[in-house]
Every structure is written in structure tokens, then in C-alpha cells.
């Protein structure tokens, strides 16, 4: 869409103006059912023609400064993935956008995949995209040649299916094979409040200032719901009530995100 092109162009340019920026393709950047179609990133990158913007589109080995990057691209298949033993370099970093076996969703479901952690042995760091929940699947172990494997998660909350917090960037310490999570402040979001027995949860007021509000109610009357809404709207007048559910049980996504 025109909006997508505009936003991505500004994002890539602004990042590249600050620091060398490396991007790889994700499943939403192309049509995996028709591999002859052009991905949406290529024309944007070519049009920007920014000297600090690098698009590692295809599976391969990319030497950048003193780091050896290896890409497993979204068009490739597991049997063709480059193994660490076939790559030379003091620091080997694998970039992959896809599901790794036993990675978790925001609801706590473990996902199956043909891509196993063992297939990444020998790399030093593995930087992942695709799964929106921030998580570290494995810590670095130099003795057993196990890389640190991490999903940095979505940049900001995308919908009600994601926790309000736990979004941002991972700042990597290449030398120590470690990272620091940097939370990106966001005034907008999708807030969910669980009303049980007519009571607000203790931490109900840690909501984004703006965005959409969803109430999930259990054992709660209409009168109690109206009272709760009045309290919430008084503190967060810019939140828009969009959904109301009556449920038998609730799952706290922000608590799940901490696991």
C-alpha cells in the first residue's frame, strides 16, 4: 500500500542516517505461494539507494566489518540452510525470519517446526524474526558451541493478541555474546482489563494513554461493568472502548510475556 511504502522508506532512511542498517526479508515481504513475484523490500531499497542500507536478501554468507553474517532466507528450504561448520569467521551471526521449534506465542503455546536449535550449533549468535513474543530460546555456551538464540519480538504491540509491554529492540554486545532489551515507549496500544467478580485487577492502571480498550468479564453484572468503565475512562479519557466479552476464564498476556 502507499502507506506501507511511505512508512518503510522513512524508517529505513532514518535508521541508515544514524547507523549502518542491515535488513532481511520476512514472510510478509513476499508472496511465498508465487516465488516469481517481486518482494516489496527490493524496490524500496533500490529507490532509496542509501549507502548505509544493506539488504541481505538471499541465503548466503555476508562479511560485514569483523562479523560474518549468514542468512537463511524465507524462500529457502531447511535442507539448503548453511551450517556453521561450512563458514569461516571469528564471529558468526545467523539471521533467520521463521519459526524455530518450541518457540512460544504470547498465549504460551509452543510451536512445532522442522528448524531445530541443534541446526544452529557452531554459530555465536542467532537473531530471529517472525514470532512476535520477545524470548531467548538458548544461552551462549562456548564449550558446547551453542549460540545465544533470540527473538527480539515485535517493535510495538500489534493487536490484542500481544502483551502491552515487552516490545522494542535488542542491543547486542557482540564481544560477550549477550544483549540488552530496550523497551520502546508507546502511548498507543491495545489494552485488556480483566474484571472478575466485579473487581478491577490491582495493576489495572498500567495502561497505554491512547488506543483501544477491551474488557473481559467473569461473574460480573452490567451495573458493575458500567462502574468499572467510569473509573477507567476517568483516568484514561483517550482510550476507546471497542470490545466487551463475558468469559469463563482469562489469560493475562502481560504475565505470560514475563515467562
Over which residues does each language-model region extend?
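Active-site-proximal segments of metal-dependent phosphoesterases and phosphodiesterases across multiple
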Residues: 5, 76-79, 86-124, 135
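Active-site environment of divalent metal-dependent phosphoester hydrolases
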Residues: 25-38, 62, 76-79, 99-104, ...
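Accessory, non-catalytic peripheral segments of nucleic-acid enzymes
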Residues: 174-259
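Conserved beta-sheet core of the metallophosphoesterase superfamily
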Residues: 106-178
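Active-site-proximal beta-strand elements of phosphoester/diester hydrolases
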Residues: 66-75, 92-99, 149-152
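Short, conserved loop/helix-junction motifs that constitute active-site signature segments
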Residues: 13-17, 85-88, 117-122, 142-145, ...
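Divalent metal-coordination and catalytic microenvironments
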Residues: 8, 26, 67-69, 97, ...
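Core catalytic region of metal-dependent phosphoesterases/phosphodiesterases
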Residues: 1-60, 119, 123
Amino acid at each position: 500500500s502507499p502507506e506501507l511504502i511511505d512508512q518503510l522508506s522513512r524508517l529505513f532512511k532514518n535508521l541508515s542516517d544514524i547507523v549502518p542498517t542491515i535488513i532481511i526479508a520476512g514472510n510478509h515481504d513476499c508472496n511465498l505461494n508465487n516465488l516469481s513475484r517481486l518482494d516489496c523490500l527490493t524496490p524500496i531499497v533500490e529507490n532509496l539507494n542509501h549507502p548505509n542500507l544493506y539488504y541481505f536478501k538471499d541465503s548466503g554468507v555476508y562479511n560485514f566489518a569483523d562479523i560474518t553474517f549468514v542468512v537463511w532466507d524465507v524462500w529457502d528450504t531447511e535442507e539448503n540452510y548453511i551450517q556453521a561448520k561450512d563458514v569461516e569467521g571469528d564471529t558468526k551471526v545467523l539471521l533467520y525470519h521463521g519459526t524455530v521449534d518450541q518457540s512460544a506465542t504470547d498465549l504460551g503455546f509452543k510451536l512445532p517446526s522442522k528448524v531445530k536449535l541443534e541446526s544452529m550449533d557452531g554459530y555465536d549468535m542467532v537473531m530471529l524474526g517472525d514470532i512476535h513474543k520477545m524470548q531467548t530460546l538458548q544461552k551462549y555456551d562456548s564449550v558446547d558451541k551453542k549460540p545465544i538464540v533470540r527473538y527480539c519480538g515485535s517493535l510495538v504491540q500489534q493487536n490484542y493478541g500481544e502483551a502491552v509491554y515487552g516490545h522494542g529492540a535488542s542491543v547486542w554486545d557482540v564481544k560477550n555474546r549477550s544483549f540488552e532489551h530496550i523497551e520502546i515507549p508507546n502511548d498507543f496500544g491495545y489494552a485488556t482489563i480483566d474484571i472478575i467478580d466485579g473487581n478491577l485487577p490491582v495493576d489495572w492502571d498500567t495502561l497505554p494513554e491512547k488506543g483501544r480498550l477491551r474488557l473481559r468479564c467473569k461473574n460480573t453484572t452490567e451495573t458493575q461493568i458500567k462502574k468499572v468503565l467510569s473509573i477507567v475512562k476517568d483516568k484514561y479519557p483517550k482510550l476507546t472502548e471497542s470490545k466487551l466479552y463475558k468469559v469463563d476464564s482469562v489469560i493475562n498476556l502481560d504475565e505470560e510475556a514475563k515467562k
